[in-house]
Regions:
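Signal-transmission coiled-coils
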Residues: 35, 39-274, 286, 290, ...
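Acidic ATP/Mg2+-coordinating residue in the GHKL
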Residues: 338
Length: 456
């Protein structure tokens, strides 16, 4: 039975000794043959926790976990073991990157963040929210008073640690991107390395999204700093149980439009249509993380506006961007159509490639600004956000006319399950196996001179 199911079931039932009886205390000892205490140093700790697979949660489980029955103690017990597992799994893959990439200052900085975060989390591995002696002890207090104070202190310390880790990892994406640029500029990129780096970054950034989701949920639910703005009071952590899709789309459009107006002094209009096939006549709502959806549509709007403005620059008339939203029994689909001239078929894959970008190199210290072009990571990261809860993002282009971008999101919260990378033999082989030659004929860039071939 997965660790997540044990703990989430306990969360709904309320706190108690049942977790220990269910085998939670044995989850990192009985199956592995050793305990983390027996491993020495960071490499040993990483090796130990990387032996375990992450426990993916569904959107429904996130909702149940953050409901009125939510228990901070259960969140503490789950995260103190799940977060090291997720960190260690991806840290093993970081160590398999090319040596020259690992030596870049930016990648070394990212590694140091992950090591520090893992060590801070492991400070809690032997502590209990109810273990008074582990956290706090004062003379002249009754055991009940001490236990209550210690339980509160432990949870507060852990929550502060979670918030500190979340803030530390704020710039993981641009910093790792900077490392890839440093490597590319110094050593160039061959096809095999490019393929391995693409494989790694997809998994690394997906892991980062999942870790941040856990950190955000705990800090927003138990951070103790109020409920946020009135518009977010119905949220469960970062999840809106009734996310109004059209409102998020309009928000993304307006913000992208402001940037477009600043840069091009004009912008295309928006034509928005919705079709609720599941509940006709009702607004389209779905259980989702609004910030994830916003990231996707904002990125797509920026791309569509940029293409439209540049393709029609000489005409002075800019066709509108059309967005169609439909909700069916299984999928929520958002299709964004522009008339920005499209992209040749051979270039579509490049748009999702981290190693390929025509944009000028940005500075990391200004990475929090939102330009119309940056590292070239907008589309691949947006695709990962869509895939994180079993959705997807696809591009369909008509060269000379325009592009359709389609976002797929699961309509049911029970189907929206985390997609998590796991370090195993298959992943290891991907980094260490020599890729064989293509088993299909690859056409040359120039046509062959057939006069050089003579019949026998």
């Amino acid at each position: 039975m997965r660790l997540a199911r044990l703990l989430l079931g306990a969360a709904l039932a309320g706190p108690g000794p049942g977790l220990r009886a269910a085998g939670f205390s044995r989850s990192f000892s009985s199956d592995s043959g050793s305990s983390p205490a027996s491993e020495r140093g960071v490499p040993g700790q990483v090796d130990f926790y990387a032996r375990f697979s992450p426990s993916p949660l569904s959107m429904k489980q996130f909702l149940d976990f953050g409901s009125v029955n939510a228990c901070e103690k259960t969140s503490f017990m789950f995260l103190r073991q799940e977060l090291p597992v997720r960190l260690a799994n991806i840290m093993k893959e970081i160590s398999l990157l090319p040596d020259n990439l690992l030596r870049t200052p930016s990648v070394q900085l990212v590694q140091s963040w992950y090591i520090q975060s893992l060590q801070e989390l492991l400070d809690f591995k032997d502590k209990s929210a109810e273990d008074a002696k582990a956290i706090y002890e004062r003379p002249r207090r009754t055991w009940l008073q001490v236990s209550s104070l210690c339980c509160m202190a432990c949870k507060m310390i852990f929550t502060d640690t979670v918030i500190r880790i979340r803030n530390r990892h704020n710039d993981v994406i641009p910093t790792m991107a900077q490392g890839v640029i440093e490597y590319k500029e110094s050593f160039g990129v061959d096809p095999v390395t490019s393929q391995n780096v693409q494989y790694f970054l997809d998994r690394f950034y997906m892991s980062r999204i999942s870790i941040r989701m856990l950190l955000n949920q705990h800090s927003l639910l138990f951070g103790g700093k109020g409920k946020g703005s009135p518009s977010h009071r119905k949220h469960i952590g970062s999840i809106n149980p009734n996310c109004n899709v059209l409102e998020v789309i309009k928000d993304g459009y307006e913000n992208a439009r402001r940037l477009c107006d600043l840069y091009y002094i004009n912008s295309p209009e928006l034509e928005l249509e919705e079709l609720n096939a599941k509940s006709p006549g009702q607004p389209i709502q779905v259980v989702y993380v609004p910030s994830h959806l916003y990231h996707m549509v904002f990125e797509l709007f920026k791309n569509a506006m940029r293409a439209t403005m540049e393709h029609h620059a000489n005409r002075g008339v800019y066709p509108p961007i059309q967005v169609h939203v439909t909700l069916g029994n299984e999928d929520l689909t958002v299709k964004m159509s522009d008339r920005g001239g499209g992209v040749p078929l051979r270039k579509i894959d490049r748009l999702f490639n981290y190693m390929y970008s025509t944009a000028p190199r940005p500075r990391v210290e200004t990475s929090r600004a939102v330009p119309l072009a940056g590292f070239g990571y907008g589309l691949p990261i947006s695709c990962l956000y869509a895939q994180y809860f079993q959705g997807d993002l696809k591009l369909y282009s008509l060269e000379g006319y325009g592009t359709d971008a389609v976002i797929y999101i699961k309509a049911l919260s029970t189907d929206s399950i985390e997609r998590l990378p796991v370090y195993n033999k298959a992943a290891w082989k991907h980094y260490n196996t020599n890729h064989e030659a293509d088993d299909w004929c690859v056409p040359s860039r120039e046509p062959k001179d057939m006069t050089t071939f003579r019949s026998a």
